[in-house]
Amino acid sequence: MPRFWTPHASARQRLVATAILLWLLGAAFYLLFIHDFVPDEALFWPSLGIALGLSGGVTLWVLQGISRKTWVVGDDLSGYGIKKKTLLLLACLLLLGFASWINTGYLIPRYLTRVIGSSAERSDLVTTRKHYGKHRTCDYSLDGRWSRGLLVSVCVDAAFHQAAPRQAFSVRLRTRESALGFIVEAVSRAPAMLNR
């Protein structure tokens, strides 16, 4: 944490820096481990607006603290020139904005859906896809109308993928739903009569 504060930083500065770090870690946790939440389309613009407002507000508040000398910059950053400080500020603003969008658009709505949502079932036409590469969420996933989300990936095992036809087929999704979106809890092949 020395990059966030000096040994003489105030308790408020330490608290705010810790809250920002936890906010960033929450978004990183979602990106790495959770991909089963499909947000409602109406949630996109409000979550983006909240994310931009939050990241901009926090950045302006920290800048104001730096200019008033109530926020003491760490020793590593105090030697930077104006160009490096500006680039670092823009990078921090983008990172905080992206993390805020993940948290307000995916992580918090997913948590609320888990707590207040109700169980439901839906069927959909999907295809399976094999993922290649070192950095992937899972080896096999489903593609359907709901998988259009940037951070949505419903994983299936190799046996499900190999048994699936190459064209679109019908699946039954067990979900937990709320007005914010739905969480895909389980996937099973729909009965033959639902296949098209």
Kindly give the residue locations of the regions a language model identified.
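Membrane-embedded alpha-helical segments of integral membrane proteins
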Residues: 11-71
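Internal/C-terminal transmembrane anchor helices
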Residues: 77-107
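Structural detector for short beta-strands of small beta-barrel domains
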Residues: 114-135
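Short aromatic-glycine-enriched beta-strand elements
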Residues: 132-145
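A short macromolecule-binding patch
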Residues: 148-154
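Cytosolic juxtamembrane N-terminal segments of multi-pass membrane proteins
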Residues: 1-12
